[in-house]
Amino acid sequence: MKDSRGKRRCLAFLKGLRLKTDPNLPGAKQKTPFNISRFWLLVIIVIYTATSACIYFDWSAIRNLLLTVGKYKHLNVGDYPDITLSPQYKRINSLYPITLAIHFTMSVFCGFLYDHIGPKFTAIIGQMCNIMSWVFLSIDSTTVDTTFLSFVFLGLGADTAFIPILTISNLYPDASTFILTVVGAAASLSYAVPATLNFICRRYPSTPFPYICYGYIFLILVPCLLVATFLLPLMPFKGLDYYIERDQSRRSGAEGDAHRGRRGDPKMVTSQTNDEVDVEMQPFENAQSEASKGRSGNGSNTPSTRGNTPNGGKQTRGKTTSESNRSSKGEGSAIQGVEEEDQATNSSKGVNEEDSDFHRKSISLFFKVLLSYPSICIIVYFILFNISTVFYGMVTDTYFSYDRSIINIINILMPISCIPCIIFGRFINRYGSAIIIILMNAFSALMHLTALIKHRAAGLVSAFLYMCVTSIYTSQIYCFIQNSFPSVVFGKLLGFASLCGGLFSLLCEKLYDQIVSKDGASIDPTNVVLLLVIAFILMFLPLTVLYFRKYERSIEDLHQEVAMSQSSGRA
């Protein structure tokens, strides 16, 4: 009896995880370039991402490729029994934190470009940087450090080509966070690119490395550039919060008109200009009940223009809000950004006026959001997470010097990390990303501790945890930001979080110097690992607060709430 009950509960849980998307939602019907269906656009973007995203995140494979083709070999003055102690190895390893720092520093500029000039031109800039990167890598020179220049451009192009495609998630408004992790899973597949090129170099040693580089440029990067040019929109697709705000504003306006009609009062009861912005960080737990009362309680009230003028139109002077419905206890959403949009016109004058106002408002809102608790907490977490992951990638050869086969297993696991990424994405779409962030915090500590145990079983556990951590490397941050903050500042906030993570990753080079003995004969990462583990343990407290205060909205619960409110409105 108990077994059958448990089985039914398990089946009910699995059925609850089944994802259904509604193609009739307003966001799903947005116009796409060449009217391509949202499904085929997603397929093309997945291929685009899998072949040209952050390929250097599997640093072990990149390092092996550079060693195979002899980059920096001229730095070695003799033979080294342990390659990890050679100047060539150290120089190649130093490229990782530098590239990551450039990558994430560029992210903040990419975020502004995404929000203000749109995904198309941002992605074009990114792919041009990627092409330049491989052009420089194909050049073998000892007078000019072309390898360093190559990784500079690789860092510049990584997020600049990747972040713009995240706008595809807005075409799936009831599954947006899951789509973000699907794209993140495709990025995990891109980890196979350096391993594949390394295999080609080893299999066909007579093939000059520049030929391989140009083959990658013309077969992969040029088609990706064409995708960015023709299939990405000029302005980001509008998010779910835009349509919720518009619908609730209209219903609130209709209710207000009816109320005034009964009282015979032709004037507005209350109005608020678009210049007044109130940003209030509060838990999301009461947002849905507020939404059902007619207030915009979707967790990010600012219209999801993501850089475009709201609805491309002109706002009316008397924009009403439902502030009167706010309870005295301060119930609210994660971000109370009071900005709304009304009737659209096609006049270019209206668009230009709104453009000017939008940029000023968006930047002002960004700085207010930046100082909120969830923003600070998630940025601090990402800094620690980034340092941990980069350091692990730099010392894999040291961790597993007793069994090199584990490193080969890591190279295999990295591309297939797309599988746990999709699984995590499904849970994020249903339960929010905060719980997954807490899980990744635990995994990050455990992967270092198990790596210190010189045993094959512990090493395999560490490799598996590393795969899980890297599978959702930045997707966890993307999803939290999308669920918790106004989508109008998505690019800027994401870019700033990446900037902080990237700059602090430069500490990894100093940490690596600390674990090398003074005579350069041995490497012991134990002290640094213990420091990282203590930091992760301390991080559990603010992350737990973040989870229980419910700063982020559940996409699926919100969609159900919207559907109910729309049906009641029609009734």
Curated annotation (Swiss-Prot):
Protein name, entry field: Cationic amino acid transporter 8
What does the entry say about activity and pH?
Answer: Active at pH 6.5-8.5.
Could you name the domain of life of the organism this protein comes from?
Eukaryota
Could you tell me the membrane topology recorded for this protein?
Multi-pass membrane protein
**What is the protein's major site of localization?**
membrane
- Can you tell me which family this protein belongs to? Belongs to the SLC43A transporter (TC 2.A.1.44) family.
**What's the gene?**
NPT1
The protein's location, in the record's own words, is: Membrane
The protein's recorded glycosylation sites are: 35, 298, 325, 346, 386
Role, per record: Sodium-independent cationic amino acid transporter. Transports L-arginine, L-lysine, L-histidine and L-ornithine.
Q: Does the keyword rRNA-binding apply?
A: no
PANTHER family xrefs: PROTEIN FMP42
**Membrane: present as a keyword of the record?**
yes
Q: Which residues cross the membrane?
A: 39-59, 94-114, 117-137, 148-168, 177-197, 217-237, 365-385, 405-425, 433-453, 461-481, 488-508, 528-548
Tell me which InterPro entries the record gives.
Answer: MFS_trans_sf, SLC43A_AATransporter
* Swiss-Prot/TrEMBL catalytic activity: L-arginine(in) = L-arginine(out)
Native source species: Plasmodium vivax (strain Salvador I)
Identify the taxonomic lineage of the organism of origin.
Eukaryota, Sar, Alveolata, Apicomplexa, Aconoidasida
